[in-house]
C-alpha cells in the first residue's frame, strides 16, 4: 500500500522514517519531494574507451558551490539529493521524477528502487534529452519518493550502496554472477 502524506508525516514525527534535512513543503499528498544536491559524477570519457561491467570505471566528480549546474544536451550525469533517507525494514520507496521536470526533457533515474533498511543519500541518474542545455538549480525540488509498506519479514538492505554520501559511482563490477 502506498503511504499518504499524512502517514508519512506521522512516521517522520515518530522517527520511524527519517529524511534530513526536510521542510513541510516537501511532503506531498502521497510522496516526499527531494532536492538536488551539489555533488556530481560523470564518466571520464577521456580515460575510458568502453564501459565494462567487469572493472571499475574512471569517473570525474565534483562538488559545486554555484547556485546552478548546466547539463549539456544528450548528456548523462549522476547527481545526489540534498536529503539523507533512512528507511525502516518494513518500508520501501520508489524514486520518481517530478512531472514538471520531466516536461522539460530531463529524465531522472532509471534505477528508482530504494530497498527496506536503506540509509544514505539517493543517487540520481540524470539525462538531458533535449538539443538545448538545461540549467539545474541546486536545492530545487527535482524528484519524489513514493513509500510503500512491505509485507512479511524482510532482511534490511546490506548492499554496496548502504550509507552512500553524494552521487555514487556504479559498483556493478562487484556483483557476483
From Swiss-Prot:
Which annotated residues bind dCTP? Answer: 98-103, 110, 115-118, 123-125, 144, 157-160, 164
Concerning SUPFAM superfamilies, the annotation shows: dUTPase-like
Indicate yes or no for the key word Nucleotide-binding: yes
Cite the entry's keywords alphabetically.
Answer: Hydrolase, Magnesium, Nucleotide metabolism, Nucleotide-binding
Q: Which Pfam family name is an example for this entry?
A: DCD
Q: Which reaction does it catalyse?
A: dCTP + 2 H2O = dUMP + NH4(+) + diphosphate
Query: Which chain positions carry the site (Important for bifunctional activity)?
Result: 112-113
Q: Which GO terms describe its biological process?
A: dUMP biosynthetic process; dUTP biosynthetic process
Documented activity regulation = Inhibited by dTTP.
> Quick one: which pathway?
Pyrimidine metabolism; dUMP biosynthesis; dUMP from dCTP: step 1/1
Q: What is its EC number?
A: 3.5.4.30
Q: Does the keyword RNA-binding apply?
A: no
Name the InterPro entries on file. dCTP_deaminase, dUTPase-like_sf, dUTPase_trimeric
Induction is noted as: Repressed by both deoxycytidine and thymidine.
Which cofactors does this gene product need?
Mg(2+)
The GO terms this record gives for MF are: dCTP deaminase (dUMP-forming) activity; dCTP deaminase activity; nucleotide binding
Q: Where is the active site?
A: 125 (proton donor/acceptor)
Q: How does it assemble?
A: Homotrimer.
The family database entries (HAMAP family) matched by this protein are listed as:
dCTP_deaminase
Q: Which family would the database say this protein is a member of?
A: Belongs to the dCTP deaminase family.
Explain the purpose of this protein.
Bifunctional enzyme that catalyzes both the deamination of dCTP to dUTP and the hydrolysis of dUTP to dUMP without releasing the toxic dUTP intermediate.
What protein does this entry describe? dCTP deaminase, dUMP-forming
Q: From which organism does this entry originate?
A: Halalkalibacterium halodurans (strain ATCC BAA-125 / DSM 18197 / FERM 7344 / JCM 9153 / C-125) (Bacillus halodurans)
| Gene name tied to this protein | dcd
Amino acid at each position: 500500500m502506498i503511504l499518504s502524506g499524512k502517514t508519512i508525516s506521522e512516521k517522520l514525527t515518530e522517527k520511524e522514517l527519517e529524511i534530513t534535512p526536510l521542510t513541510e513543503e516537501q511532503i506531498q499528498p502521497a510522496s516526499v519531494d527531494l532536492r538536488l544536491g551539489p555533488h556530481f559524477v560523470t564518466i571520464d570519457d577521456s580515460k575510458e574507451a568502453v564501459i565494462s561491467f567487469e572493472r571499475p570505471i574512471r569517473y570525474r566528480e565534483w562538488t559545486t558551490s554555484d547556485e546552478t549546474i548546466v547539463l549539456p544536451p544528450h548528456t548523462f550525469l549522476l547527481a545526489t539529493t540534498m536529503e539523507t533517507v533512512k528507511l525502516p525494514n518494513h518500508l520501501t520507496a520508489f524514486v520518481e521524477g517530478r512531472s514538471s521536470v520531466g516536461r522539460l526533457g530531463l529524465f531522472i533515474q532509471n534505477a528508482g528502487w530504494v530497498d527496506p533498511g536503506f540509509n544514505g543519500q539517493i543517487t540520481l541518474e540524470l539525462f538531458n534529452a533535449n538539443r538545448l542545455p538545461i540549467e539545474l538549480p541546486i536545492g530545487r525540488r527535482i524528484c519524489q519518493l513514493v513509500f510503500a509498506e512491505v509485507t512479511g519479514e524482510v532482511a534490511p538492505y546490506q548492499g554496496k550502496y548502504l550509507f552512500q554520501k553524494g552521487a555514487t559511482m556504479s559498483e556493478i563490477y562487484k556483483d557476483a554472477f
